[in-house]
A protein has these predicted regions:
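Short, Lys/Arg-enriched, Trp-marked, Pro/Gly-tolerant hinge/linker segments that flank
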Residues: 4-68, 81-89, 93
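Flexible coil/turn residues that form the inter-helical turn or adjacent wing/linker of helix-turn-helix
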Residues: 8, 57, 105-107, 117
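Short, leucine/isoleucine-rich alpha-helical interaction segments at C-terminal helix-coil junctions
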Residues: 22-29, 106, 131, 142-143
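Short helix-to-turn junction characteristic of helix-turn-helix DNA-binding domains
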Residues: 51-54, 102-106
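Basic/polar phosphate-binding segments, predominantly the helix-turn-helix DNA-binding elements
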Residues: 52, 58-94, 113-142
Length: 145
C-alpha cells in the first residue's frame, strides 16, 4: 500500500502512520510480546478535535501529540484502539465528508479539494476513488438522480 503512492509526495501524517504500521509489524514478526495496552481517551479525543479544526491544512503527528499531551507513538496507538483507524485515515475521511458536502452545495471539484485541505484536485480524486470506488464526478452524477 505504501509503495503504491510513491508517484506523489506523502502527506506527513500519512508517512508517520506508515512508520507506525512498520514498527508494529516488526514487533509482531520479532516476537515481541506486549501486555494489553492502556490508553488515554482524553488525549485521543483532543487529537480528533484538533483534526476537525484543521481540515484545511497539513497536520503532522507531532502537532497532534502536542495538542493531545501524549507522545506521537502512544497517541497513534491510542487513536487506533479507540477510533478503529489511524489518525491519517480519520483525517482523510473527514476531508472527504467535507468534499461531498461542498460538491452538493455546488462547489467545483478544484474548490472543494482545496477547501477540504487536499493538496490538489488530483490528490482528492485519488482518495475519493479509493474510498468510494468511483470518481467524484461520477458520484455527483449519481447523487443528482
Amino acid at each position: 500500500m505504501l509503495l503504491r503512492s510513491l508517484d506523489c509526495p506523502l502527506d506527513p501524517l500519512e508517512e508517520q502512520d506508515a512508520l507506525f504500521d512498520l514498527a508494529q509489524a516488526l514487533n509482531t514478526v520479532g516476537g515481541v510480546t506486549t501486555t494489553r495496552p492502556s490508553f488515554d481517551y482524553v488525549a485521543a479525543e483532543r487529537a480528533r478535535e484538533y483534526m476537525h479544526s484543521a481540515l484545511d491544512r497539513t497536520v503532522t503527528l507531532e502537532e497532534l501529540a502536542h495538542h493531545s499531551g501524549r507522545d506521537r507513538w502512544s497517541l497513534s496507538r491510542d487513536f487506533r484502539l479507540l477510533f478503529g483507524t489511524s489518525p491519517y485515515r480519520y483525517l482523510t475521511m473527514r476531508r472527504l465528508d467535507l468534499v461531498r458536502s461542498l460538491l452538493i452545495q455546488g462547489q467545483s471539484l478544484v474548490s472543494a479539494a482545496l477547501i477540504a485541505g487536499f493538496t490538489d484536485q488530483s490528490h482528492m480524486t485519488r482518495q475519493f476513488s479509493k474510498t468510494y470506488g468511483l470518481s467524484p464526478a461520477r458520484w455527483m452524477k449519481m447523487h443528482r438522480r
